[in-house]
Design a protein with these regions (language model features):
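ATP/NTP phosphate-donor binding region
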Residues: 1-35
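A short, small-residue-rich loop immediately preceding and capping a beta-strand
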Residues: 28-51, 55-66
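Active-site segments that bind and position negatively charged phosphate/pyrophosphate groups
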Residues: 141-250
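Glycine-rich beta-strand-to-loop/alpha-helix junction loops that act as flexible
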Residues: 7-9, 39-41, 169, 181-182
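A glycine/threonine-rich phosphate-anchoring loop and its flanking beta-alpha core
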Residues: 50-144
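Residue-level signal for inorganic ion chemistry
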Residues: 65, 104, 183, 210, ...
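C-terminal charged capping/lid subdomain of soluble metabolic enzymes
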Residues: 1, 121-123, 225-303
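Nucleotide-activated sugar donor-binding and catalytic core shared by glycosyltransferases
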Residues: 33, 96-98, 109, 229, ...
Length: 303
């Protein structure tokens, strides 16, 4: 057994990080009959699992995620890699198939509450893609999750895995994009805030993306306004407050549209029409502009 200590940026691994992993696999004579084990956050587990999948046709990989968001996601999705700092689009990804994922919930109970909030935001978005009954179960157990109760945490992880697997295995191609809900808004805000975005926690950017896109969904696909407010309430229950900032609507709208085409040629967003029904939906310019103006005005008032 050989140990490799890999320092990966929480923002995401690069191909340079992958090259280090490949070098270690080669130096240690790892073959497809061996086992690669990754211990770390989402970015670390993602790059190691990606490398193991390429090595010798495919080498089995086991993951031991150490953060709550990683426990919820690494079995089904990986954090995309970037080619280099000069090509910073995080677009190198595949569906991970680790042979084993082991979650130590003591790490969740002992963690700083601030370090759990990205996991909470991911959990809210994931549960929106599940059924109405599962969403209701989830919202009722938020206090127990926050208290670190074992049964509630086990249920949260299990519900997340089931919901994410169902999305990836959906027969409707449109439904397979459900896990991207909120991410267009997240990327838009990150770009528009510029250097200031580095001071904003990742969970807050993702949460703002979900808040904004939930409002778009109300107009674009008749998403019940009560559920829009439930999303807001759930995020606030997890201690994720609204973010205060001042942006020009025209610049925000232009960047939002640009982000839609970064990963796809379709001008459509994964939006919830109902609980458990997040589908690709076309958003009219008038709807986007109206909601963007209202959203940005509300955030400016927080300053």
């Amino acid at each position: 057994m050989s140990l490799l200590v890999l320092e990966v940026s929480p923002a995401g691994a690069t191909l340079a990080d992958a090259d280090i992993v490949f070098g270690a696999l080669s130096a240690n004579g790892i073959t497809c009959d061996d086992l690669v084990v990754a211990v770390g956050d989402t970015a670390t587990c993602s790059v190691v699992c990606w490398c193991a999948n390429q090595w010798c046709g495919r080498t089995e990989c086991a993951l031991l995620p150490t953060t709550f968001d990683a426990m919820l996601t690494v079995a089904t999705t990986m954090k995309p890699l970037v080619a280099s700092s000069a090509h910073a689009l995080p677009a190198i990804a595949f569906r991970p198939e680790p042979g084993l994922v082991v979650c130590d919930l003591d790490l969740v109970r002992e963690a700083d509450p601030e370090d759990l909030k990205l996991g909470y935001a991911v959990l809210v978005g994931t549960m929106l893609s599940s059924s109405k009954s599962r969403w209701n179960q989830f919202t009722e157990t938020v206090p127990e999750i926050l208290a670190g109760e074992e049964v509630a945490l086990v249920n949260a992880v299990q519900w997340s895995q089931t919901a994410r697997k169902d999305v990836l295995m959906a027969t409707n191609p449109s439904a397979r994009h459900a896990l991207d809900f909120g991410k267009t808004g997240e990327r838009t805000l990150r770009v528009c805030l510029g250097d200031a975005a580095s001071q904003v926690p990742a969970y807050q950017l993702l949460s703002e993306g979900m808040r904004f896109e939930a409002r778009l969904a109300h107009d674009a696909c008749d998403f019940d306004i009560d559920y829009v407010f439930e999303v807001d309430d759930c995020l606030e229950d997890f201690g994720i407050e609204e973010l205060a900032f001042d942006l020009e609507p025209a610049a925000y709208i232009e960047e939002f549209r640009r982000q839609q085409f970064v990963r796809s040629n379709r001008s459509m967003l994964p939006l919830p029409a109902a609980l458990g029904a997040i589908r690709l939906t076309s958003v009219e310019d008038e709807v986007l502009e109206r909601h963007a103006h209202a959203y940005l005005a509300s955030r400016k008032e927080l300053l």
